[in-house]
């Protein structure tokens, strides 16, 4: 009974973390739509139906903002971290491992949120100046 309770509590925590990551990804997706409206002319194909990562890859082709976007869609960037954390939450847990540093804790999620906030602020400032 205690084992089942622990599993359920762990599942709830994973669900909360996963919902947080989905919310952050959705927020960045809507922000990508906003950026697209500001930087692209009307003759380009709309990106609203694309996934978050594909939207940002498409926006990275714009020379005015590519230096800000490319580091965040490549390895170690905000978009990549969101995807990596989602994969960690979905992956089955291995009980045969004694320790692992791949767990997702509140500190990592808070750092991800701070990084995404700084990235959005920098991009907004850049777009306002151009």
Regions found by a protein language model. Give the residues of each.
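Intrinsically disordered, low-complexity linear regions
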Residues: 1-5, 18, 56-64, 81, ...
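Charged alpha-helical initiation segments
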Residues: 1-16, 129
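Amphipathic, well-ordered alpha-helical segments in soluble domains
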Residues: 3-7, 23, 30, 119
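A structural signal for alpha-helical segments
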Residues: 12-15, 19, 104, 111
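Short, hydrophobic, well-ordered secondary-structure elements
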Residues: 16-37
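Short acidic alpha-helical/loop segments enriched in Asp/Glu that coordinate divalent cations
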Residues: 32-52
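Long, charged low-complexity segments
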Residues: 42, 51-115
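Glycine-rich, aromatic-bearing surface loops/beta-hairpins
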Residues: 111-130
């Amino acid at each position: 009974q205690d084992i089942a309770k622990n599993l359920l509590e762990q599942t709830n925590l994973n669900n909360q973390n996963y919902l947080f990551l989905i919310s952050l990804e959705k927020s960045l997706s809507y922000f990508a739509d906003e950026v697209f409206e500001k930087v692209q002319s009307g003759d380009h194909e709309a990106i609203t139906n694309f996934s978050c990562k594909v939207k940002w890859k498409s926006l990275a082709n714009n020379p005015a903002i590519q230096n800000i976007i490319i580091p965040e869609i490549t390895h170690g960037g905000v978009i990549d971290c969101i995807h990596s954390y989602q994969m960690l939450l979905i992956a089955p847990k291995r009980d045969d491992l004694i320790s692992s540093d791949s767990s997702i804790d509140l500190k990592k999620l808070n750092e991800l949120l701070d990084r995404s906030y700084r990235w959005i602020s920098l991009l907004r400032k850049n777009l306002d100046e151009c």
